[in-house]
Amino acid sequence: MIAKQRDRRRGRITAALVALSSLAALISGTQQAVAEVKHIEIADKGKIFKSEPASGFVLHPREIPGVDEGQTARSVIEGAEAKGVVTRVSPLSVAQSKQHIGRPLCHTTGINGTFKYNGFCWDETDDKTSAWSNGWHPQGFTASHDADASGTVDGHHLYMATWYYGVKGSDRNKKARISILESTGTERTYGHVLLVRPGGSRTDPQFTSVDDVHADGMVWYGNRLFVANGGELQIYDLNHLWKVNSISEKSGIVGGTSSAEYHQWALPMVARYSNRTKAQQDTAKPEKQSNMFCDGAIACLSALSLDRSTSPPRLVSGRYGDAEREAEVDVIRWPIEYLGEGGTSPVSATAAYKAPVHGLQGVATDGTYYYISAMCDTDYMKVAEPSDPAAYYCIWQAVPDGPVSILTRTPPLTQNLSYSFSSGRLWGMNETNGMRVVFSLLPRKADNSQYLYNDYSKLCSGVGSTVENSKPVIQWRCNGSEDELWVFEETKDNNGNPAYFIQNRYSGKCLGTGSSLANGKGMIQYTCNSKVDEKWWYDQDTHELRNVYSGKCLGLGSAATKGSQLIQWTCNGAQDERWIISRTAPKV
């Protein structure tokens, strides 16, 4: 949310972040003038993701402004369709319109290669557009894996993102759109849909673009689309996705003509909930009357995802917290079955947690772990200033009432997350203009990582907390650090015999010989590329690791000291060629 760059919620962002930093935020291809970032020390690793009482978090059913008394949003929508001024279409048809053509992954992500990440980019225009300069910023993310347990809708993999529009500076949150994209694996096509609010009556239907909106998060479930907006939850019905019959700057219906501010499609709201009653909102101070307002004392929906591990599923929301905040931020679970059209009773949360992280932007769960996009700890993988909007973000993980830990770095200002129960992949996207990507990864891929312990030196193999290609793989005192853990991924040699890629848990790089055949050649880490010099045979009886390319054994030579580089040598049965692979750190 450009570090939730919004003028709207006092305390939601610090002056240090509003003033930005040396952000490589491109606006129309030029670099934005920014100020120096204030140094803030962040050290959240090990803090507890703890349960808290949920009864105080409530969503109240609210009216949709502009609908005539005695009418409903549904009746207005049906009236517009009956007049023939709009045409109902499917999400798939929007995606397949090819209004925009996405690109393969085009920017550096910072994601650890261990987690087998992939993804795509928007087209160049949507990559660079900015809500700070007459354009758009992306926020929420959902997909067909949320909509249907099969992972597809009408047999297709579809993805959606919310965007909010701004004119310049603080004049943002003017309107919102969603993008509907289909990915076939080789082609990514999408279209933009304006979010609109119905008004008037069945006999005199009208609509206008939704304003006062940041569109923080989004969940697609069945035919319903839930859009989080800070202090508000908006609901849309995708069975009433409209194609308008004219393209102009106007929004609404005039005679027999419908238009949606230069959009081909519009999606009307059918219901809304708020963290306050109408009386509470109307009597609030002027600066707190926005639909987006939340201050932490009440439910704050700054992120939204779907948990399909329960039946029925649960909505999961998260509250944003800036770099300087001290208190934890709320992660709340909501009963989706009670949130819909025609609601007359408040809906209470079913569970809640305190997330001890800075800059929460997204949250999702696989039913066991919660995944949170937030600022990295200071100096994690050389992230010196986590509050710098140009800095990598991190995905954190935790089980309820357990400590938080970093899973991986992610692109700067990573926003909402979405977990696919059909594929086991965690999806996300970031908002930094000129650096935007949509990505997915396998978050549990490193769960079976193991220590590689030398029988001669009694030391563990590691990478010295480096992430760069060609850095030496060394031995060090076994201390349980992440860079001493290795993922042994099964593969085959050229003859179909079992072999392994050995991938470092910390760097995500593979252990290899640098395509060398020489005795004494030092082992290095390198981006895994499936080359034969990254493949290893392991003999369970002799405990030898033999490189498939060179045929040489992994060893130490005569070196038994901390920091010495691992080498390859003609296999000779020496003790320094014996390696113990263990799930637990050796005790020495």
Q: Model-found features: residue ranges?
A:
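Sequence/structural signature of beta-propeller modules
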Residues: I2, L23-D126, R444-K445
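Surface-exposed loop and turn segments in beta-propeller and other repeat-based domains
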Residues: S93-N134, R188-S209, S248-A297, G343-P356, ...
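Blade-loop segments of beta-propeller domains
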Residues: E124-G151, A161-V219
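Structural signature of eukaryotic scaffold interfaces centered on beta-propeller domains
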Residues: A131-G155, D211-Y221, C294-P313, Q361-D366, ...
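Loop/turn-rich, solvent-exposed surfaces of beta-rich toroidal or solenoidal domains
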Residues: D146, R314-G402
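Short loop/turn segments immediately following beta-strands, especially the blade-tip
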Residues: E182-T186, D237-S258, E328-T344, L441-K445
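Extracellular glycan-recognition/adhesion modules and their associated mucin-like linkers
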Residues: Y369, K445-N469, L485-A518, K535-T561, ...
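Blade-level signature of beta-propeller repeat domains, shared across WD40, Kelch, NHL, RCC1
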Residues: Q415-A446, I580
